[in-house]
Amino acid sequence: MKASPHRPTKALIHLGAIRQNIQQMGAHIPQGTLKLAVVKANAYGHGAVAVAKAIQDDVDGFCVSNIDEAIELRQAGLSKPILILGVSEIEAVALAKEYDFTLTVAGLEWIQALLDKEVDLTGLTVHLKIDSGMGRIGFREASEVEQAQDLLQQHGVCVEGIFTHFATADEESDDYFNAQLERFKTILASMKEVPELVHASNSATTLWHVETIFNAVRMGDAMYGLNPSGAVLDLPYDLIPALTLESALVHVKTVPAGACMGYGATYQADSEQVIATVPIGYADGWTRDMQNFSVLVDGQACPIVGRVSMDQITIRLPKLYPLGTKVTLIGSNGDKEITATQVATYRVTINYEVVCLLSDRIPREYY
């Protein structure tokens, strides 16, 4: 989807806030810990290339989801190590060697498929993924890890790292987290040769389980100033939200009592009301379930009335405002603020999803 720069809807990205968040997190982890910035999914909706360029001197490398995201960074001139967290297709191995990417190895079947196709693995760098309880990709048995490491090294592969991912690091109970940690440690203890880089800490682990950090951390949600737990756990220190979502009033009118708004005529004015239209809708990632949520105009909460359309919403104003008046959907306006977590709570989801769903139609502006 192409960006639409000729309408007032935009996401403002505070790159300085992201850098400050990295520095803040770095000040609370063991000295010498490598910092890997997770910029997958277009840097959680913040813009992968712009974010990576802004923080490249503050981190030791980047993490992405797939090889196409990695290629985008390399072609933009980013030279630091890039770890691809997902499983890559066999055909991607040649690209990984060409662009100097680090691949994730999650199973013996993948290695065997490479060997069956006689793919030249010499010079490839990989990290082994351990499924300690997340249930997605990764080795579960120590014997398989040892076999994989031997096979890879026999064929000229550099097994640089090993990692896992915690399912409940952002929850109040530590029971499952501790069980996962013990499984991971057991596998590490069984290895004849532990790879140089060992990382298990996502944002939540980095924030609330700092004592379990190995020698690298993966900074994701928290790097963008978001609380990985939503409202479950308090942040141990301040982080600055980097994204503001704004638009403006493009149409304002007074409607009589009984007037209806939106598809399905689900909202009917019970008195004379001032109704305004804002050019943002579900095609932009402002989903249909946001009906009745309030946005900010002139420091005042104004409810979304009627269903969210593909391209527009209608809101009820306390009085007439001129066209072009700013509307804040995420961020501060006057003395009020709407956070991504508040939006997520209203949607019964997580703040990760809120920012990731903001579509490419919304231009990102950086400062």
Curated annotation (Swiss-Prot):
Domain of life: Bacteria
Reaction(s) this enzyme catalyzes, per UniProt: L-alanine = D-alanine
Pathway recorded for this protein: Amino-acid biosynthesis; D-alanine biosynthesis; D-alanine from L-alanine: step 1/1
Keyword Chaperone attributed: no
Family stated for the protein in its record: Belongs to the alanine racemase family.
Keywords: Isomerase, Pyridoxal phosphate
Protein name as it appears in the record: Alanine racemase
PROSITE patterns membership: ALANINE_RACEMASE (PS00395)
One GO CC annotation: cytosol
Signal peptide: none
Cofactor section: pyridoxal 5'-phosphate
Organism encoding this protein: Streptococcus pneumoniae serotype 4 (strain ATCC BAA-334 / TIGR4)
HAMAP family linked to this entry: Ala_racemase
SUPFAM superfamilies: Alanine racemase C-terminal domain-like (SSF50621), PLP-binding barrel (SSF51419)
